[in-house]
Amino acid sequence: MTEVVPSSALSEVSLRLLCHDDIDTVKHLCGDWFPIEYPDSWYRDITSNKKFFSLAATYRGAIVGMIVAEIKNRTKIHKEDGDILASSFSVDTQVAYILSLGVVKEFRKHGIGSLLLESLKDHISTTAQDHCKAIYLHVLTTNNTAINFYENRDFRQHHYLPYYYSIRGVLKDGFTYVLYINGGHPPWTILDYIQHLGSALANLSPCSIPHRIYRQAHSLLCSFLPWSSISSKGGIEYSRTM
């Protein structure tokens, strides 16, 4: 497709689910967009299997973009991404995995990728409601265009995956990117626990614990977090009448 795309193209874009008749077109598009070769069974699955959310963006009848995602229980997350969610979430908590998101070159920077991503979020809110806590994906470390796209939409790098991809016999590194939704979050780190302790101390009334113990805990915390907002200069004031 080499036609000049008008700036108003997004207003003419329609969305529909992929179907079996789209297989040849989708194969051609994925060959242009991605360096990975997918088996024929993959194309059959994403165009026919209802477990996939496979949405096409069309312009004047032609597919110019698509997103393929799967909403699944957290127990089905592959081992390398098993810590996307904190262990406190129940086993029936769901996540959404983006298998593919692409837009025809001439139609990029027209908002079509964002439209497809927002449509996935709408689908999640309708089907999984608040049971889905994260949307995640994998991307080549060298794919700066995709990385910038996701980072600009609040996805954050979660893992570095060395030798994750095999492309024409050559091993390539990847990243896992995650967008947390509906209160989802990763496991806490040591820094998270320290910051939580700092917040808890900041909310305590000094009169509720012995003055001396409070001062010792406060000093210890500040030694870990010199930037802490509960410093004695700008934080809690002590009463001299305690």
Curated annotation (Swiss-Prot):
Belongs to the acetyltransferase family. NAA60 subfamily. It catalyses: N-terminal L-methionyl-[transmembrane protein] + acetyl-CoA = N-terminal N(alpha)-acetyl-L-methionyl-[transmembrane protein] + CoA + H(+); L-lysyl-[protein] + acetyl-CoA = N(6)-acetyl-L-lysyl-[protein] + CoA + H(+). Its EC number is 2.3.1.259, 2.3.1.48. Substrate binds at Y38, L99, Y165. This is N-alpha-acetyltransferase 60. Keywords: Acetylation, Acyltransferase, Chromatin regulator, Chromosome partition, Golgi apparatus, Membrane, Transferase. Residues 193-236 dip into the membrane without crossing it. PANTHER family: N-ALPHA-ACETYLTRANSFERASE 60 (PTHR14744:SF15). InterPro entries: Acyl_CoA_acyltransferase, GNAT_dom, NAA60-like. The gene is Naa60. It is an enzyme of class 2 (transferase). Monomer and homodimer; monomer in presence of substrate and homodimer in its absence.
